[in-house]
Regions:
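Membrane-proximal low-complexity regions enriched in glycine and acidic/polar residues
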Residues: 136-140, 153-213, 217-221
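Intrinsically disordered, low-complexity repeat and linker tracts
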Residues: 38-47
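Secondary-structure boundary/capping residues
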Residues: 19, 23, 91, 178-179, ...
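A generic fold-level signal
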Residues: 48-50, 71, 130-132, 153, ...
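Short glycine-centered helix-capping/turn motifs at secondary-structure transition points
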Residues: 17-21, 108, 191-193
């Protein structure tokens, strides 16, 4: 089921995460690292630990989801790890859609969010990215597409989800003919013979369901990073 598949992806992601030496920053001395790095005094430390931070999100498998009243997913695991290691508490607030989340961010109703959607706000600070940003190029098995590199997408019709870091990366760097869609359902319905480009973890999650008629043609890293964004009012925590 969905839970089993999500657990597999999280496990796989953390294996890649460990292989790339990111654990050092997120080890058992995480809070002490921040305290020392930012010269935070005992009073500020107590304030950091006493507050419950509002984490805003839109359900986005496999990164952020609510399953049996638990916040789960790849991004969620980072936040839950902070709770386990430091005792910092979060209130997870789910929004119906991206517009609602953006409105809450503009009103500073959330203290932290995962910037999968490439949201710009001067009121928030970017954390250091610890994510592996990889994309997957998919084509229908019946169409016999050939993609051997990022450059080989030049002139090809490519479908992407709008309002994502991946879309911004392709818009800025690719010479493909890009068609953007607001949601996965519409993208799959109207892509026809287009190639589809999605986050690699999204592909892994849906490979046997939504993408069962597609084959993986090519994958690579993108230079646009995923970040957690933290309210500037809590810059000491950042």
């Amino acid at each position: 089921g969905n839970n089993t598949e999500l657990n597999k992806i999280i496990k796989k992601y953390f294996e890649k995460w460990q292989d790339n030496n990111f654990v050092k920053t997120y080890n058992d001395t995480l809070l002490d690292y921040y305290i020392t790095k930012n010269n935070i005094n005992d009073k500020t430390k107590a304030e950091i630990l006493s507050k419950t931070y509002v984490y805003g999100y839109v359900e986005n498998y496999p990164y952020e989801a609510l399953v049996k009243n638990k916040f789960v997913g790849i991004a969620a695991e980072y936040v839950n790890r902070i709770t386990r290691l430091s005792g910092i508490e979060f209130e997870f607030k789910k929004y119906k859609n991206l517009d609602e989340l953006k409105e809450a961010i503009n009103d500073k109703e959330v203290d932290i969010f995962f910037d999968y959607y490439n949201i710009d706000s001067d009121a928030y600070l970017k954390t250091v990215s610890t994510f592996i940003e990889e994309y997957a190029v998919l084509g229908k098995v019946s169409d016999s597409h050939v993609v051997t590199s990022f450059e080989s997408l030049k002139g090809k019709k490519v479908s992407l989800l709008n309002n994502t870091a991946l879309y911004s990366y392709f818009k800025s760097n690719s010479k493909a003919n890009i068609e953007k869609f607001d949601n996965m359902k519409t993208l799959l319905k109207k892509s026809d013979d287009n190639l589809i480009v999605v986050d690699n973890e999204v592909y892994n999650y849906y490979r046997n369901t939504k993408f069962k008629d597609y084959e993986l043609l090519y994958s690579d890293l993108m230079t646009n990073d995923y970040y957690f964004m933290v309210n500037k009012d809590y810059s000491d925590f950042y």
